[in-house]
Amino acid sequence: MIRKLCSSFSRSIIFPNKPIFIPRSFPQPLRHSSALSYSSLKMTDTHIPGNPNSSPIQSPTKPESLRSLEFQLGSSFTADPIIPPPNQIVIVISGPSGVGKDAVINKLREVREGLHFVVTATSRPMRPGEVDGKDYFFVSRDQFLSMVENEELLEYALVYGEYKGIPKKQIQEFMAKGEDIVLRVDIQGAQTLRRILGNSAVFIFLVAESELAMVERLIDRKTESQEELLVRVATAREEVRHLKNFDYVVVNAKGRLDDAVNRVESIIDAEKSKVHQRIVRI
């Protein structure tokens, strides 16, 4: 009896500002823990990871997944390309004399497929090593003027006293075959093409690494007299000022031809990857 009173009294004692709470009962140890229903913890064999005797969860096959997705989306999947093939483009390569336009063109011809290099018609005499129909179509002055009269040329110009022009038919035929077109023209021809084609063509300006390097190349060609060299160098200085009218500039440094050609290829790849493609009509 006394023990009960003491217990009751101890539960109600409150020290000043410090109440003491004595629990009425203490947690009891878990009884019969070993007797918990094994069936409530046991996983079936088919759900035990790593169990060699478990059956793999059956997943739908790829065709079944596709059919299910199509049904839920309400439309069928198509194997057609997400985007159409890129348009054919016209690449205009130009630059002053002595920058290596022909070297870049010839190397590009070796390493890049899907390009047609337009052969320009000219009234000038053939130089040593040149091949008619490959380097130029060599025609007489009268023949050239006849082509002009019949509107067979996309553009033409009088350069250093000789005519040069681009045949239309050649471009149309190869674009119809799906090939991109490369035009190698002088600065005057590039200006004319810019007026005709506007922004539908890609204009690349080739330059040497320095003016001195450009002049040395002209001298090394040994195709002009001193007076002719003077005219070409003076003209080249003027032509460099037209760089701002081009889309891209590529430096063709001595001994770095591959680098220049790689740059031109990168430009072509970038143009073919544009969301808004250029459209050429000739």
Curated annotation (Swiss-Prot):
Its main location: plastid. Residues 1-53 form a transit peptide. SUPFAM superfamilies: P-loop containing nucleoside triphosphate hydrolases. GO terms for cellular component: chloroplast. It catalyses: GMP + ATP = GDP + ADP. Residues 51-62 have a biased composition (Polar residues). ATP binds at residues 95-102, 252. One of its GO terms (molecular function) is ATP binding. The keyword Plastid applies. Its EC number is 2.7.4.8. The keyword Heme does not apply. It is found in: Plastid, Chloroplast. It is an enzyme of class 2 (transferase). Residues 43-63 are annotated as: Disordered. It comes from the Eukaryota. Gene3D superfamilies: Guanylate Kinase phosphate binding domain (3.30.63.10), P-loop containing nucleotide triphosphate hydrolases (3.40.50.300). Residues 88-269 form the Guanylate kinase-like domain. GO terms for biological process: regulation of developmental growth. The active site is at 127, 221, 232. Essential for recycling GMP and indirectly, cGMP. Plants silencing GK3 have dwarf phenotype and develop albino cotyledons and leaves. Belongs to the guanylate kinase family. Monomer. This is Guanylate kinase 3, chloroplastic. It comes from Arabidopsis thaliana.
